[in-house]
Regions:
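Conserved donor nucleotide-binding strand/loop of the catalytic core
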Residues: 40-43, 54-90
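Acceptor/aglycone-binding surface of glycosyltransferases and processive sugar-polymer synthases
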Residues: 72-90, 95, 107-189, 216-226, ...
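Catalytic donor-sugar/metal-binding loop of nucleotide-sugar-dependent glycosyltransferases
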Residues: 160-161, 186-187, 196-214
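Conserved sequence signature across two-component system core domains
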Residues: 12-15, 45-47, 74
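A conserved acidic beta->alpha catalytic loop
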Residues: 46-55, 103
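N-proximal low-complexity "stem/linker" segments adjacent to membrane-targeting elements
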Residues: 1-31, 37-38
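Acidic helix N-cap motif at the loop->helix transition within catalytic regions
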Residues: 20-24, 51-60
Length: 242
């Protein structure tokens, strides 16, 4: 039934050069789900990382079992939006979590998300950096401005009703995510935003949880100059088509 909470959660984890982060993310995820008694699987969608991410994923598959860790790689870097679509094909959970492998998201929040979902029987639970105690640590001013600017622009143009659209950490009811993916046209980071905009149009319910977003434990921030340009382009396209 629609009122059912998360019985099994599928985590879609797109990776590109995340060799150092992956074992820690997987360990934290596994521990969090086990502590909260939620059945889970982690689907690793690696886009042909040259750094040995896939070899690490194979080791993790051996350690945790292939029912818990599913490596479903692609030949080359094809972008976030299509990574989630690819991962969905293999997901068996009734709820889906989409997140980055770079530990920007407090993994322990999965438990909170599941609780929040049950509390309001939401279709989607999204983390927000700009509500209550969801502060942003370790972000330089430029990133803060870009992130706030992106959010502000999106809110002005599209009024989507979720205060942090770019925070790519969400829990979706599986059939809701499938429906949204059919409707989404964007690639890359814009994809995350479009999902929420479309969700609102289709009348799905969104619960929000404040996230204290600790900027990437290892590795450089992934939002490069050309990402930002394509983000803005995507935003305009989205504005034109909604």
């Amino acid at each position: 039934t629609a009122a059912m909470g998360p019985a099994r959660v599928s985590v879609l984890l797109p990776t590109y050069n995340e060799r150092d982060n992956l074992p820690l993310v997987v360990w934290l995820l596994a521990r969090t789900f086990r502590d909260s008694g939620i059945d889970f699987e982690i689907i690793i969608i690696d886009d042909g990382s040259p750094d040995g991410t896939q070899e690490v994923a194979q080791q993790l598959e051996k350690i945790y079992g292939s029912d818990k860790i599913l490596l479903r790689p692609r030949a080359r870097k094809l972008g976030l939006g299509t990574a989630y679509i690819h991962g969905m094909k293999y997901a068996t959970g009734n709820f889906i979590v989409i997140m980055d492998a770079d530990l920007s998201h407090h993994v322990r929040l999965h438990f909170v998300y599941c609780g929040k979902q049950k509390e309001g029987n939401f279709d989607i639970v999204s983390g927000t950096r700009y509500k209550g105690n969801g502060g942003v640590y370790g972000w330089d001013l430029k990133r803060k401005l870009i992130s706030r600017g992106a959010n502000f622009l999106t809110q002005v143009l599209l009024r989507p009703g979720a205060s942090d659209l770019t925070g790519s950490f969400r829990l979706y009811r599986k059939e809701v995510l499938q429906k949204l993916m059919e409707k989404c046209v964007s690639k890359g980071y814009v994809f995350q935003m479009e999902m929420i905009v479309r969700a609102r149009q289709l009348g799905y319910t969104i619960g929000e949880v404040p996230i204290s977003f600790v900027d990437r434990v290892y590795g450089e921030s992934k939002l490069g100059g050309n990402e930002i340009v394509s983000f803005l382009k995507g935003l305009l396209t989205l504005f034109a088509t909604t």
